[in-house]
């Protein structure tokens, strides 16, 4: 069918009638609140109690170069417009006084004359122009307005930092002759424009009532979030592909690198001591405020851990505590590790622990049978050296010389390609008996 034929096709009378009925029902709720004379015009501020709570501690709004949205969001309800007339809604911000403000000793005080403002920015609601019935059918939200401290256009409102403003709504009737119908403002919506929140009470209120905000994290937490991938829920998979080398962080989770196909559906059981290192979400803001966000990372449970960190020589070294943060010496010891060259399976017997270290002849994959390695007593693994000085009772291991090592964890499988495994003494995992069960602070590759 030719394009001209498509362009000239007309909808049937039934289709047109249906569309008109949809429009009519949409505007009917607004018509019921209308007044063709506009004498009963009324504007109500939505969420007035929330605005009042912010005003009691002097509200602050962030202004940035690229623009920042307001919270609380300015939202109003209008009644008494002519349902069949066309109106546009505009928003601007007027200074409330002739001062510049500063925050001193926990309060806002005047600090000199204000900056001269040579610009006047007006925000036009994106639904403008529209019928009065449209404006009256539901609350009107100015959620898309952005506040900036740079004059860059794009519908943003430019404000001077450390000046106090009050939003002002204008209703203009459009048609053959435009005319101002009304303008209104609400004192509880006043705020001081800032580039960073000054009052911690305001910060806490913003976090409490705006759980989607990202601007309220402390600098320490923001730096921490730059070093780790974006927060995910427990039901999602996580992939760390750009961290360079293997990193076993202090918390219960494991961060893997070098292979974007490695995914963990659940954290491996490597609990952490009481330390701020590792993949975790800081639950408090500046030490005492609660954040409304779910925990972004696996939390600590204050128990011992084993840290594996890749050295420059691509050897995997074990750090067990603050007193032993140096490389382990490589000394031959014949009685430590038995490595028979065999392709047959090894049946070491049952183990009560949820995490098993398995060695297979392949290149490391999530499936496939292979000989297993079980630790009968607490221990850790060292990659790269053929033997390490350690008591012979630490680990009983049988494996081929070149193998792929798999970690069987519930509910996921993870693979690590290695050449040789040896054993050294270390602190036990959580829940294992034996000496050295106390937690120690270990270095982490995720230190901020």
UniProtKB/Swiss-Prot annotation:
Keyword Transcription regulation among UniProt keywords: yes
Entry coiled-coil feature ranges: none
GO cellular component terms, semicolon-separated: chromatin; nucleus
GO molecular function: DNA-binding transcription activator activity, RNA polymerase II-specific; DNA-binding transcription factor activity, RNA polymerase II-specific; RNA polymerase II cis-regulatory region sequence-specific DNA binding; sequence-specific double-stranded DNA binding
Key words of the record: Activator, Disease variant, DNA-binding, Nucleus, Repressor, Transcription, Transcription regulation
Pfam families: T-box
GO-annotated biological processes: anatomical structure morphogenesis; cell fate specification; heart morphogenesis; mesoderm formation; pituitary gland development; regulation of cell differentiation; regulation of cell population proliferation; regulation of transcription by RNA polymerase II
Localization per record: Nucleus
InterPro entries cross-referenced by the UniProt entry: p53-like_TF_DNA-bd_sf, T-box_DNA-bd, T-box_sf, TF_Brachyury, TF_T-box, TF_T-box_CS
PROSITE patterns in alphabetical order: TBOX_1 (PS01283), TBOX_2 (PS01264), TBOX_3 (PS50252)
DNA-binding segment(s): 45-218
Entry function: Transcriptional regulator involved in developmental processes. Can activate POMC gene expression and repress the alpha glycoprotein subunit and thyroid-stimulating hormone beta promoters.
Disease with which this protein is associated in UniProt: ACTH deficiency, isolated: An autosomal recessive disorder that is characterized by adrenal insufficiency symptoms, such as weight loss, lack of appetite (anorexia), weakness, nausea, vomiting and low blood pressure (hypotension). The pituitary hormone ACTH is decreased or absent, and other cortisol and other steroid hormone levels in the blood are abnormally low.
Protein known as: T-box transcription factor TBX19
Species for this entry: Homo sapiens (Human)
Gene label: TBX19
């Amino acid at each position: 069918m030719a394009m001209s034929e498509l362009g000239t096709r007309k909808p049937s009378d039934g289709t047109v009638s249906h569309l008109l009925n949809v429009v009519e029902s949409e505007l009917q709720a607004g018509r019921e609140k209308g007044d063709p004379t506009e004498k009963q015009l009324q504007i109500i501020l939505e969420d007035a109690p929330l605005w009042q709570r912010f005003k009691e501690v002097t509200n602050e709004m962030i202004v940035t170069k690229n623009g920042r949205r307001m919270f609380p969001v300015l939202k109003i309800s209008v009644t008494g417009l002519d349902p069949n007339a066309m109106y546009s809604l505009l928003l601007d911000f007027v200074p409330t006084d002739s001062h510049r403000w500063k925050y001193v000793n926990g309060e806002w005080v005047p600090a000199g004359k204000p900056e001269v403002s040579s610009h006047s920015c007006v925000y036009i609601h994106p639904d403008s122009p529209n019928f009065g019935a449209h404006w009256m059918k539901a609350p009107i939200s100015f959620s898309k307005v952005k506040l900036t401290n740079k004059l860059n256009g794009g519908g943003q409102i430019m404000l001077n930092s450390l000046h106090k403003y009050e939003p002002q709504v204008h209703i203009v009737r459009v048609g053959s002759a435009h005319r101002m119908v009304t303008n209104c403002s609400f004192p509880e919506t006043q705020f001081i424009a800032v580039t960073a929140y000054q009052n911690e009470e305001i910060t806490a209120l913003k976090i409490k009532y705006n759980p989607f905000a990202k601007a309220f994290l402390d600098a320490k937490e923001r730096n921490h979030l730059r070093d780790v991938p974006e927060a995910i829920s427990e039901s999602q998979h996580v992939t760390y592909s750009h961290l360079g080398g293997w990193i076993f962080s202090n918390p219960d989770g494991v961060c893997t690198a070098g292979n974007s196909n490695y995914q963990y559906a659940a954290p491996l059981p490597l609990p952490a001591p009481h330390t701020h290192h590792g993949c975790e979400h800081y639950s408090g803001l500046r030490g005492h405020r609660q954040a409304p966000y779910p925990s972004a990372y696996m939390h600590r449970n204050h128990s011992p851990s084993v840290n594996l960190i890749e050295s420059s020589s691509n050897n995997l070294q074990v750090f067990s505590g603050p007193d032993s943060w140096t490389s382990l010496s490589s000394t031959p010891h014949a009685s430590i590790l038995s490595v028979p060259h065999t392709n047959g399976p090894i049946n070491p017997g049952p183990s009560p622990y949820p995490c098993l270290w398995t060695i297979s002849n392949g290149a490391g994959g999530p499936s496939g049978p292979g000989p297993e390695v079980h630790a009968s007593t607490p221990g850790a693994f060292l990659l790269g050296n053929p033997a390490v000085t350690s008591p012979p009772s630490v680990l009983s291991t049988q494996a081929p010389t070149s193998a792929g090592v798999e970690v069987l964890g519930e509910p996921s499988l993870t693979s690590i390609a290695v050449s040789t495994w040896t054993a050294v003494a270390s602190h036990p995992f959580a829940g294992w008996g034996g000496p050295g069960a106390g937690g120690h602070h270990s270095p982490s590759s995720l230190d901020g």
